[in-house]
Amino acid sequence: MLVWLAEHLVKYYSGFNVFSYLTFRAIVSLLTALFISLWMGPRMIARLQKLSFGQVVRNDGPESHFSKRGTPTMGGIMILTSIVISVLLWAYPSNPYVWCVLVVLIGYGIIGFVDDYRKVVRKDTKGLIARWKYFWMSVIALGVAFALYLVGKDTPATQLVVPFFKDVMPQLGLFYILLSYFVIVGTGNAVNLTDGLDGLAIMPTVFVAAGFALVAWATGNMNFANYLHIPYLRHAGELVIVCTAIVGAGLGFLWFNTYPAQVFMGDVGSLALGGALGIIAVLLRQEFLLVIMGGVFVVETLSVILQVGSFKLRGQRIFRMAPIHHHYELKGWPEPRVIVRFWIISLMLVLIGLATLKVR
């Protein structure tokens, strides 16, 4: 919005030309989302407390979590609000990639909101029925994937980028739709599963978004894309603005979500952020990179799959409790230790993921 306005005002004052610089807009996008999130935080927490929108805690969970019962949840609303406002202000409104991310972000946010609302207001511990949750998540993911396939068919936008191999970028054909679906829905659920401790999900999300900001910048720059042997995608540069907005909103939320948390993001935040990371990976053709950089989310999800599978097949559990962060809690690790160690692992994985772009 402001970019469009600046383009019309630059003929009156050349200083408005600064709005055309991607680096400048990335920085102010981050700061805008950060300040909106910090401003909304106390007001959102007070409002959620007044409405008695408190966290529901499992009776079979770690005893240390019982004290969290009643802590305001659905704080993801302020994350999404911060991201959307910042992106609309600083990204080019004509960029289709930006709108793809916003559709998934808002769509998954609505699904998460309904799920949280049923849990918190209607006191339904199961929330939105699983089949309906997956149905609507699938509708959004398949809709976006199909639209992208129709537009980008037989172009670099539908190639598969394979790490470590600079000349291996096969055309996916219709498999592009299926892969995109699994990445978007899978990442949405993976971040949702990770969101079980104070600040555990938001910081890896920030790290991955920051990593993708660098990848988006390189992908949207023909010289760097050729240098790194990744597809050049002319719309990818604007995803830098989206990624930095996620970073800013995430850091602002962490101010209130750090241990001991004053507010939880709820499904409205975790599903939306996960879906956003998934569609960003799809748009940048970096699904494999997401698996590496988002390794914490992958391990959390695998721990649940292995736990359920083992119990159904053998009648035995592999972990004391899944997702795996609860396993370490039940082993006696203090919650802050689990959180910070997962943060460190996440940062390392993002750096390793970025390094794979050059190792080809």
From Swiss-Prot:
- What family classification does the UniProt entry report for this protein? Belongs to the glycosyltransferase 4 family. MraY subfamily.
What is the name of the protein in this document? Phospho-N-acetylmuramoyl-pentapeptide-transferase
Q: EC?
A: 2.7.8.13
Top-rank taxon, per record: Bacteria
Q: In the UniProt record, does the keyword Cell division occur? A: yes
Q: What does this protein need as cofactor? A: Mg(2+)
What EC class does the entry list?
transferase
Topology of the protein relative to the lipid bilayer: Multi-pass membrane protein
Q: Which ranges of this chain reside in the Cytoplasmic compartment per its record?
A: 47-71, 115-131, 189-198, 257-262, 309-337
State the species of origin.
Salmonella typhimurium (strain LT2 / SGSC1412 / ATCC 700720)
Enumerate the PROSITE patterns for this protein: MRAY_1, MRAY_2
Segments on the Periplasmic side according to the record's topology features: 1-25, 93, 153-167, 220-235, 284-287, 359-360
InterPro entries registered for this protein in UniProt: Glycosyl_transferase_4, PNAcMuramoyl-5peptid_Trfase, PNAcMuramoyl-5peptid_Trfase_CS
